[in-house]
Amino acid sequence: MNILKNKKLIISYIILGLVFILMGSSNNNPSTYMERIFKPIYFKNGIFYYSTIISIVLVYYSLKNINDEKKVKYINSFLSRLIVAIIFMAVSAWLNTYTTKIYKSFSNNLNAIYMNRDETSMEFDCEKNKITVKGKISIINCSNEIQEFKIKVKTPPLVKSQIKKDYFVLSKKVKIYPRQKRDLYINEEFDYKLKENSIFYDENIFEYVLFNDKDQIIFKGSSDYYFEENMY
């Protein structure tokens, strides 16, 4: 009986460890590892993310099993276990930002660049004969070497349907020193004729590509971006 109890506890701790890891992401892709395993379901008018539900259920029942054996005060009821499960997932995602930066610090090329997605956003203001790209890209060089590169921003789907251009290549060349955090402010105009008089995007979901003569690194957009891309 004790062997079964020990196995149950060990399995519960292993599940918690796996969820902790899978709630993270690589920064290059904003989707968590859990979301990449349990991919969102795309409907005509939206997306259903069920990976979060699976994560909560796994953490909840792991906590329940631990409480059944250990009688832990803070997880002895349905509500307390649910609250702890949600906090556990939030803390896992938060801690992942630090582990990702540590991992990137071992690179000596563009893979050492970390993007602060919460501080990065881009506007596309499209008039009949002109497209203005402006916004802020917040990055950190996690390595001990200087990194130099240019940036491409993937064209928003509705704009791409009219100009047939995959990326806007920004003219500014970026140089970022070791361990430096930089906010890059963008404001560039491109001459294009649009079928529609006005299109406006103000989002932080876009895909960005950092590139130089040696290599490139892609920071993928959110699932919402690719959902919209599939509509056009």
Language-model features, listed with the residues they occupy:
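Short, solvent-exposed loop/turn segments enriched in Ser/Thr/Gly
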Residues: 129-136
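Intrinsically disordered, low-complexity Pro/Gly/Ser/Thr-rich segments with frequent PxxP/GP/PP motifs
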Residues: 165-195
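Short acidic, flexible loop segments centered on an aromatic residue
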Residues: 144-161
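Low-complexity, acidic Ser/Thr/Pro/Gly-rich terminal tails and inter-domain linkers that flank the onset
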Residues: 95-129, 158-160
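Terminal connector regions
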Residues: 190-232
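Internal/C-terminal transmembrane anchor helices
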Residues: 72-101
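Membrane-embedded alpha-helical segments of integral membrane proteins
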Residues: 14-66
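Membrane-interface helix-boundary motifs at transmembrane edges
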Residues: 1-5, 66-79
